[in-house]
Amino acid sequence: MTPKIRAPFLARRTYIKSLGALGLLGVTGVPVRGESFAQSVAPATLDPILPYDPRYTALIRGFNQRFEGDPSYIQLCASPQQVLQAVQSAVDAHLRITIRGGGHCYEDFVTNNDQGVLIDLSPLNAVYQENGLYCLEGGCTLWNVYTRLYKEYGVTIPAGSCYSVGVGGHIAGGGYGLLSRKYGLTVDYLAAVELVHVTKDGKAQLVTIRPNALNPAECDLFWAHQGGGGGNFGVVTKYWFKNLPIAPPVAYLTNIAWNWPELHQEQFSQLITNYGNFFAGHSAVDSPYKDLFTLLRVTHKAGQQIILTIQYVGDHPELIDQFVQAIAPQGIRYVSQPTSQDPHRLPQTPGTRKLSWLEATQILNGSGPNQRGKYKSAYMLRPFTAEQINVMWKFLTMSSYANPQALVLVDSYGCQVNAVSSTATAIPQRSAIMKLQYLTQWVMPEEDRIHLQWIRDFYTAMYGPPGPYPD
């Protein structure tokens, strides 16, 4: 079973758990100054989207098509002042509030708000620089952020690959992506957060919080936004960042695959073992492989191929071949032009491609079509055990469950991510070497039970009934 991550006891973690949604008692912050162009031209209010509005049925669903809500209304907000008004109106009416940025939430935490208020931040999406800091408004999506930061300032954030993910929840959860081994997590660059919260007497307030505030509660709240999750502490209207890294000038992309029909269990075990062992030995801050990021898509055999995607953004692209040689199992060839129909794969071009970083980021977009799905995650502190690899083989070769969209995605982790103390932010997994995502996707509602049972049985077999230790 996977070693469980047990973070040291932190009073701040208790603080996070003690806060209700939007109820941030004792936090005053500092006055909000200035406004973006989008705010200056936004109307005082936007009309709510009610159930009879033709847009309503489209907006009560997000990325995961399993979930459909029934809110009393959907309130679009194009400025922090509109968010402030929307929150106050909901509080006055005693309506539950949920928040949506990109709508990419995997579980039913957003649209599941029957007769409540869904605050949609998508119109609040400006990206700009002011007083030496970079501002991302709460409704931005990642592709919007990448293109604006790259084209206008030449910098980036080390966030995720899915273009449609909203920054509001993604950054509050840590902000991990393909540049994290090189640059760390997005929250490591966070300088301030502007948000709307509610006082104990029911008054909505728009405040800006910083890590060096005199008020300890404000410092704790800022810390919580560095990985404590989104939607729990208020409605984030702006993130401010300092010293963002320069975007890499080029990126080298390689895509290789192993054909399932040619793969025996011994070779499968060797591949998974070698992959884990490599990152156990190359996840230190000073690793020569810190510019290397990999995504191993260990698909169900119905998907025909196990696909490895490699991005390298350093000065020694020959390290790509060295990595492949280190992890490739013996006795089976890999193909350098995968033929899988996986919607997330790279275009079918053999060998390594040298691209601009922005073009590579666009190619590696992992959003795919909106479907029904179930997702689970875990972090690995050390390589897979033989027992775990046997469990993976069992569930990924199961003939009674043949879904080509079922897989385990094993991302490389560590290096600059782990340069930061596990107590400095609300991210405790600063010693992990791999990040796992178990997922299965499908289309038909009547198949829900089959797919949910498979992934739950798989996850339980990997970690035991309690699962990995959450904190």
Model-flagged regions — what are they?
Residues 2-12, 16-471:
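Soluble FAD-dependent oxygen oxidases
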